[in-house]
Regions:
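Short beta-strand scaffold segments in enzyme catalytic cores
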Residues: 42-47, 150-154
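Nucleotide/phosphate-binding catalytic cleft detector across ATP-hydrolyzing
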Residues: 1-37, 48-142, 159-166, 170-279
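Short, structured patches in soluble enzyme cores that scaffold and shape functional sites
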Residues: 144-147, 154-156
Length: 279
């Protein structure tokens, strides 16, 4: 049965946002760690036995591009820093972590980073599948719009039957904004986050392209729901654009969608790797 969006998912996402780079919530063992290596950010999240977030570390970082870790040393350094912070905050030691990868890319890319940071892998799966598993969907589509790619998964009778990845995401939003305003890419990234409503007319065509990509992948699949996830979905205007493009489908976009994939990864470790938790 699908998790209830308002009673189960939204409170967990809201809690993750409140905990981000802050003091952890009170918790008891066992605890599970998930690490999301994104194009624009690295997020490490710890959840408890109920799948509730208890600690979250986030760094905006340019270490992954289009599913490829181009700054391996930088990625390992960030993961080690997150690990040290979480262990100090929670008073425990993490030996295992779950992670994910964009569909169609090599999972060893993420695995190598975590292993180089001193962690063993408790579970690894592609990003939209992680979200689909978290939501416990049936006959639905999941669209994970991250920094560098848009991942699509089709779920039938509780199982992921199709997944794909397209090289369009938040990074391309920043490129469009940088060109429009005549500014550097790093400045565009910061401007995007602080002037989200203002930039919508400029970046809307990129999201329209994303919606057309999604339409191509879900055509004929017979899904009855469409879920959006990923940090790039937090741009005001995205939900309404997808609702207009897919009028026959309920389109779900929970608040704080930036944390959906990290929450899904951490929960995948909890559900698939019982016993591989903090000590």
């Amino acid at each position: 049965m699908a998790h209830d969006e308002q009673r189960w998912l939204s409170p967990r996402l809201q809690k993750a946002a409140a905990l981000c780079n802050q003091a952890p919530a009170a918790s008891e063992s066992p605890l599970w760690l998930g690490i999301d290596l994104g194009t624009c950010d690295v997020v490490s999240m710890v959840v408890d036995r109920d799948g509730q977030p208890v600690a979250v570390c986030l760094d905006w970082a340019d270490v992954v591009r289009d599913g490829i870790v181009w700054d391996f040393f930088g990625a390992v350094t960030l993961v080690r820093r997150h690990l040290a912070t979480l262990e100090q905050q929670l008073g425990c030691r993490f030996t295992h972590a779950a992670t994910s990868f964009p569909p169609g890319t090599d999972p060893r890319i993420s695995i190598n980073v975590l292993e180089s940071a001193g962690l063993e892998i408790s579970h690894v799966l592609d990003e939209p599948t992680a979200v689909a598993d978290l939501l416990q969907l049936d006959n639905a589509g999941v669209v994970d719009i991250g920094g560098g790619t848009t991942g699509i998964a089709i779920v039938k009778q509780g199982r992921v039957t199709y997944s794909a990845d397209e090289a369009t995401g938040g990074h391309h939003i920043s490129l469009t904004l940088a060109g429009n305003r005549g500014i550097g890419l790093e400045e565009a990234e910061q401007y995007k986050r602080s002037h989200a409503r203002e930039i919508w007319p400029v970046v809307k065509p990129v999201y329209e392209k994303m919606a057309e990509i999604v339409a191509r992948h879900i055509a004929g699949q017979g899904i009855v729901d469409l879920w959006l996830a990923g940090g790039a979905c937090m741009q005001p205007g995205v939900h309404e654009l997808f609702r207009q493009r897919f009028p026959a489908l309920p389109v779900h976009l929970p608040q704080y969608s930036l944390f959906m994939t990290p929450l899904a990864i951490a929960n995948s470790g909890r559900e698939k790797a019982e016993g591989m938790y903090a000590s």
